[in-house]
């Protein structure tokens, strides 16, 4: 099966990002037909709003702090004909402007519409499912693409940079959404997560508001190890 990016609905998903209008204008200059969902509280509800807006079986989300590479529109993804794609989310890497990390955080995502309409994650997650309370990636079947076709600009203000660092400081310190004891932190946490966590806490002081991102990551890690609740990763949304 071939999935042509240009044939999918593309939705700009923004909440309160200080650079949202600037980034939306940039997206419209590249994708004039892009749709938009703005200001919906809760990650689960916001993604459902995207799905309800779309007319295609799959849709692509562009986060409010993102700008895309126009080459993305020319991409075609080859998928296994025998694979069940009804729960598969295709995730591209995004490059973080603060510290240069390139991974799934902030990257473009291609979602199956019906799955999104029926999923229960974040604020709508079952209380017995700690994984879904923190992120989408452990309940859905993620197909991670190594290519990066977007840049995350999450340092327009000190608050935005701090929040970006804080959320990653929390999430990268968890094991599939669950807290790791201090004794097991370095043995149970994936080495890639530890590397990215180190970068978030050490790199970026040379860019605007980068020190705030570093502080946020350190505070997020500290709270996770000492005071963690399942709401910690969402504290920055309020």
Tell me what each language-model feature is.
Residues 73-173:
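Conserved catalytic core of nucleotide-sugar-dependent glycosyltransferases
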Residues 1-52:
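N-terminal anchoring/stem segment of glycosyltransferases
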Residues 59:
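Short aromatic/hydrophobic "clamp" motif used to bind/position activated sugar donors
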Residues 21-22, 70-73:
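Short glycine-/acidic-enriched loop or helix-start segments at secondary-structure transitions
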Residues 63-67:
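The conserved acidic donor/metal-binding loop of glycosyltransferases
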Residues 228-233:
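Conserved small/polar residues in nucleotide/adenosyl-binding loops
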Residues 173, 177-206, 211:
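Phosphate/pyrophosphate-binding loops and the adjoining catalytic core of nucleotide-dependent enzymes
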């Amino acid at each position: 099966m071939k999935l042509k990016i240009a044939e999918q609905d593309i939705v700009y998903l923004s909440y309160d990002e200080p650079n949202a209008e600037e980034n939306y204008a940039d997206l419209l200059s590249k994708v004039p037909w892009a749709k938009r969902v703005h200001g919906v509280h809760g990650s689960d509800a916001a993604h459902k709003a995207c799905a309800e807006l779309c007319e295609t079986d799959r849709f692509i989300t562009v986060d409010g702090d993102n700008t895309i590479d126009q080459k993305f529109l020319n991409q075609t993804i080859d998928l296994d004909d025998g694979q069940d794609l009804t729960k598969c989310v295709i995730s591209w890497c995004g490059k973080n402007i603060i510290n240069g990390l390139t991974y799934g955080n902030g990257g473009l995502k291609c979602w199956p519409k019906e799955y999104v309409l029926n999923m229960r994650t974040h604020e709508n997650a079952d209380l017995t499912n700690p994984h879904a309370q923190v992120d989408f990636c452990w309940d859905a079947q993620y197909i991670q693409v190594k290519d990066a076709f977007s840049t995350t600009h999450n340092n327009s203000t000190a608050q935005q940079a701090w929040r970006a660092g804080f959320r990653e400081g929390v999430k990268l310190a968890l094991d599939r959404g669950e807290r790791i004891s201090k004794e097991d932190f370095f043995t149970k946490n994936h080495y890639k997560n530890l590397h990215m966590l180190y970068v978030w806490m050490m790199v970026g002081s040379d860019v605007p508001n980068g020190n705030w991102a570093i502080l946020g990551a350190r505070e997020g890690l500290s709270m996770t190890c000492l005071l963690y609740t399942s709401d910690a990763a969402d504290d920055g949304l309020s």
